[in-house]
């Protein structure tokens, strides 16, 4: 006796099955008794498949636009290349506190008028005066690399 399988469209990401909006084949009992009642999937009818294609085209266009914008921002940030911040220093080259992602985000906003989320900024521990490499993840595949120069604050 063979299993009956049906095509369903996933409404959310399900581990080991697929991502949201994927069309997959599952056992009809699994679909009827679990996926569909829990609103995790819908039966893949012709209307739903057309709707999927339409929304996929819209998502693709939005992604393309976002990627172009991210590349423009990357080019702008890498043209500037170095951002500076002044911090109070103690003995030697040690600074009081450290430089945070929020501060870098604010410096970039003040300089270029571009909002960068602090979660997308990756930097090493900044505890001394010097130049540091900072990586900014603008999009899944687009990252900008800038230099952060930490200077002693003049009294």
Swiss-Prot record:
PANTHER family, A to Z: 50S RIBOSOMAL PROTEIN L9
Signal peptide: none
Recorded coiled-coil stretches: none
GO biological process: translation
Family statement: Belongs to the bacterial ribosomal protein bL9 family.
GO molecular function list: rRNA binding; structural constituent of ribosome
Protein name: Large ribosomal subunit protein bL9c
NCBIfam families: L9
Free-text function comment from the UniProt entry: Binds to the 23S rRNA.
A UniProt-annotated Pfam family: Ribosomal_L9_N
GO-annotated cellular components: chloroplast; ribonucleoprotein complex; ribosome
Main localisation: plastid
Record keywords: Chloroplast, Plastid, Ribonucleoprotein, Ribosomal protein, RNA-binding, rRNA-binding
InterPro entries, per the entry: Ribosomal_bL9 (IPR000244), Ribosomal_bL9/RNase_H1_N (IPR009027), Ribosomal_bL9_bac/chp (IPR020594), Ribosomal_bL9_C (IPR020069), Ribosomal_bL9_C_sf (IPR036791), Ribosomal_bL9_N (IPR020070), Ribosomal_bL9_N_sf (IPR036935)
Subcellular location: Plastid, Chloroplast
């Amino acid at each position: 006796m063979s299993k009956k399988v049906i095509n369903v469209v996933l409404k959310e990401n399900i581990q080991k099955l697929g991502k949201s909006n994927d069309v997959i084949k599952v056992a009809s009992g699994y679909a009827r008794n679990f996926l569909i009642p829990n609103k995790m999937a819908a039966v893949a009818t012709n209307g739903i498949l057309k709707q999927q294609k339409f929304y996929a085209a819209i998502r693709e266009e939005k992604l393309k636009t976002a990627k172009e914008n991210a590349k423009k921002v990357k080019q702008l940030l890498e043209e500037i290349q170095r951002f500076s911040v002044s911090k109070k220093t103690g003995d030697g080259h040690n600074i009081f506190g450290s430089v945070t992602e929020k501060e870098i985000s604010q410096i970039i906003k003040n300089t270029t008028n571009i909002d960068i989320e602090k979660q997308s900024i990756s930097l090493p521990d900044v505890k001394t005066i010097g130049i540091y490499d900072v990586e900014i993840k603008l999009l899944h595949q687009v990252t900008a690399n800038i230099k952060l120069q930490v200077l002693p604050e003049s009294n």
